[in-house]
Swiss-Prot record:
The chain crosses the membrane at residues 10-30, 46-66, 78-98, 130-150, 152-172, 199-219, 224-244, 291-311, 332-352, 354-374. Gene3D superfamilies: Sodium:dicarboxylate symporter (1.10.3860.10). It is found in: Cell inner membrane. One of its GO terms (molecular function) is fumarate transmembrane transporter activity. The gene is dctA. Keywords: Cell inner membrane, Cell membrane, Membrane, Symport, Transmembrane, Transmembrane helix, Transport. This is C4-dicarboxylate transport protein.
């Protein structure tokens, strides 16, 4: 029988306390709060430092160790099908809610009076994101460049190709696979060390947010924020909840299982900060490494449910606030554009806001200057986006793993029932995401 660790040693508790302290510091001592921004930035940079090698190790080890290469293509196909269906539902829900609630109605803002210079940089970056450009950008100019820039999709593409090539080498490639497995141990140990700094990162990021923007900015456009937050909660509990029930598990138990990762995302407003831990958690939940390695990184670009809800709601809100008429044709056009543009929301600084700028420019009917209306509260809305995206990718991983019969359902139910152990718990040798002993044989 193991002794339960004290509450104060739990990362879950430490991050909650850090967020609370950050809010108080930012509110009562705003200058101090703003000065703490480097804590949050530094923590996120530390995480990003190891994301690329962790994705590489996980994907290569998973693919190279598979017996049947057809299953990789099958997994990718099912994942993209799931992503497209669920993200479309998210876009539709956002569109329906914003039309029913109409949070921007009655504001009567003249778009010509808005300061478009505040959003000029976002519009420029958004216009640079074409569909063809996005697809071509998945192919790295150099291998080193993909890792140096930390571009998730470029690293993922190279990792898949490398994994296939290593598998084709058979026994000759086994020493390379052994090295990659051991290198993965080192990377996940680094993550464990970095995660001890998560409370400091959450404190700094939250103190800066409240100190820089103030609690008052939460009230100014509160109706849109409340509407968006409620919609995200309903989407998770109803839509994702129904998907989970249909596949034999509970979304509430899944949320409880990834509670530490959700708190880290809440504190940093960056879903990337939880990516390495999600790779470990989903594999521990019973999904095969090959599935986890493909679905989680790909989902960070193609399965952004929270961002999808935000994009439709924000676009129509701007139309309502500026008294810009949008009939059913305009809204269908908006939806079709977002079905494409929303897939480019990852790997770009200020991703959701930039994609929104690109969408408004592409639709043409909506005033791009209207982005200035939500620029001040976008930082607060990004937290709900990131949390919803994280839960969505966790659900996607389990569902796709079940579809391709790469899910240990007994392990799934056992882990969900227990609520999950902290990742720093070393009672099992595979807690670092890689099994001890020799690498899997390559046939």
């Amino acid at each position: 029988m193991t002794t339960r660790q004290p509450l104060y040693k739990s990362l879950y508790f430490q991050v909650i306390v850090a967020i609370a302290i950050g809010i108080l510091l930012g509110h009562f001592y705003p200058q101090t709060g703003v000065a703490l921004k480097p804590l949050g930035d530094g923590f996120i940079k530390l995480i990003k430092m190891v994301i690329a090698p962790i994705i590489f190790c996980t994907v290569v080890s998973g693919i190279a160790g598979m017996q049947n290469m057809k299953s990789v293509g099958k997994t990718g196909g099912y994942a993209l099908l799931y992503f497209e269906i669920v993200s479309t539902i998210a876009l539709l829900i956002g569109l329906i809610v914003v039309n029913v609630v109409q949070p921007g109605a009655g504001m009567h803002i003249d778009a010509s009076t808005l300061d478009a210079s505040k959003v000029a940089a976002y519009v420029t970056a958004g216009n640079d994101q074409s569909i063809v450009g996005f697809i071509l950008n998945i192919i790295p100019a150099t291998i080193v460049g993909a890792f140096a820039n930390g571009d998730i999709l470029q690293v993922l593409m190279f990792s898949v190709v490398f994994g296939f090539a290593l598998h084709r080498l058979g026994a000759y490639g086994k020493p390379v696979l052994d090295f990659i497995d051991r290198f993965a141990h080192v990377m996940f140990n680094i993550i464990n060390m970095i995660m001890k700094l998560a409370p400091l990162g959450a404190l700094g990021a939250m103190a800066f947010t409240i100190g820089a923007y103030g609690v008052g900015s939460l009230v100014q456009l509160g109706q849109l924020m409340i509407c968006f937050y409620i919609t995200c909660v309903v989407f998770v509990l109803v839509v994702l909840g129904a998907i989970c029930r249909a596949h034999g598990f509970s979304v509430i138990k899944l949320i409880r299982y990834i509670r530490e990762e959700l708190l880290i995302v809440l504190g940093t407003s960056s879903s990337e900060s939880a990516l390495p831990r999600m790779l470990i958690k989903m594999e521990r939940l019973g999904a095969k490494k090959s599935v986890v390695g493909l679905v989680i990184p790909t989902g960070y670009s193609f399965n952004l449910d929270g961002t999808s809800i935000y994009l439709t709601m924000a676009a129509v809100f701007i139309a309502q606030a500026t008294d810009t008429h949008m009939d059913i044709t305009h809204q269908i056009t908006l939806l079709l554009v977002l079905l494409l543009s929303s897939k480019g929301a990852a790997g770009v600084t200020g991703s959701g806001f930039i994609v929104l700028a690109a969408t408004l420019s592409a639709v043409g009917h909506l005033p791009v200057a209207g982005l200035a209306l939500i620029l001040g509260i976008d930082r607060f809305m990004s937290e709900a986006r990131a949390l919803t995206n994280l839960v969505g990718n966790a659900v996607a991983t389990v569902v796709v793993a079940k579809w391709v019969k790469e899910l240990d359902e007994d392990k799934l139910q056992s882990e969900l029932a227990s609520g999950g152990r902290p990742i720093t718990d070393t009672r099992e040798t595979d807690d670092l995401g890689v099994a001890e002993g020799p690498a899997p044989s390559i046939k």
